[in-house]
Amino acid sequence: MTTYFDKIEKISFEGEKSTNPFAFKHYDANQVILGKTMAEHLRLAVCYWHTFCWNGNDMFGLGSLERSWQKNPNVLAGAEQKADIAFEFLNKLGVPYYCFHDVDIAPEGNSVREYVQNFHHIVDILERKQVETGVKLLWGTANCFTNPRYMSGAATNPNPEVFAWAATQVFNAMNATQRLGGENYVLWGGREGYETLLNTDLKREREQIGRFMQMVVEHKHKIGFKGTLLIEPKPQEPTKHQYDYDVATVYGFLKQFGLEKEIKVNIEANHATLAGHTFQHEIATACALDIFGSIDANRGDPQLGWDTDQFPNSVEENTLVMYEILKHGGFTTGGFNFDAKIRRQSIDPYDLFYAHIGAIDVLALSLKRAAKMLQEKTLQKIVNARYAGWNSELGQHILQGKTSLETLAQLVQQKDLAPKPVSGQQEYLENLVNQVIYS
């Protein structure tokens, strides 16, 4: 295997007292928590795009990162080199999974024929590398937003030929995900939205993307893909308004097209921030609607109106997120994919390790704290007591449809009901959470 990160062999767990920057302080893959190992709980993945494709460019500057494989005049050979380096990184970091878009791993080429040939060639290589290293594919997806053909959307494009091109990419990416043993397939509508309503037919575009998703479901069953289909919500960027705004919006879309039993959600922390929600809110909403699937782990900046895709570094935030996940029973096919990028000034190749090690330790510590909260049941006892009235005869009759507005109005008058307010105890609960986090 190509050696690019030759300063280190493999990242290992050394414990909280370690000062080694190339060691985990909290992530012990084999530590058992609530009956599962830490590795089984977190199901960690590294993303191909930010980690191995982004060169550090932004809207105001050229690439700042040294990526030798991007300078290869033979782009296919460069993609092969990138695969070598990617799997060296994955193997040394010790994560079990990775994720990719189709054009992350292979050059798109100048025609659909070249696209298919290049993609299949690199998939052959990835298949071999998975066998060599034991690293698995958490999910695959298709990039139907970067190429200029998608400037007006992919499935929502006014031109059905563009719709067909997007279908071609998803067809190939789904088949590759199936072949590589991927456990999920993700659909993010990067340009499925609008810039202005002056040239947009909302109803038509909604019907187009609804049909596209139905076709994806049909293909899943046709090829026998056993993984989970996931939609990734995002409110805006690159379009002004995107149709998959947040978890609740996606659920409404799925219900409209009869897909709520077929597709779940892949929730990104930064996208929750852009939608004006907390990360915990989006996770809790998905769990309540039974569409929780997977997570893109990162963080945004509430002071900025765009996707900063920074690595997660808040144990406070992620403890509450982990608590929601554990309450729901944990991941099934999903996991924590680090959809995050180092900063433009982090030009040392080993900054990739520092970023991932720190983020993994944040999730590991958050898992331990959330597990303690769940085991102590303090929060759940208070929530149960708060809603205890709904277990009464009155509460059950309301929920079971045995009452009406009229009968309830009569009941209130007959019994002269005068319910007294009860404290929500928010400050007390926040103190309990902090006590667990900082103990």
Swiss-Prot record:
GO terms for cellular component: cytoplasm
GO molecular function: magnesium ion binding; xylose isomerase activity
UniProt keyword list: Carbohydrate metabolism, Cytoplasm, Isomerase, Magnesium, Metal-binding, Xylose metabolism
EC code: 5.3.1.5
Predominant localisation class: cytoplasm
Cofactor(s) of this protein: Mg(2+)
Gene Ontology BP term (one): D-xylose metabolic process
Active site location: 101, 104
Localization per Swiss-Prot or TrEMBL: Cytoplasm
Amino-acid positions noted as binding Mg(2+) 1 in the UniProt annotation, renumbered to this chain: 232, 268, 296, 339
Catalytic activity: alpha-D-xylose = alpha-D-xylulofuranose
Binding sites annotated in the UniProt record for Mg(2+) 2: 268, 271, 307, 309
Lineage top rank: taxon: Bacteria
Record text on cofactor binding: Binds 2 magnesium ions per subunit.
Family under the similarity heading: Belongs to the xylose isomerase family.
Subunit structure: Homotetramer.
Descriptive protein name: Xylose isomerase
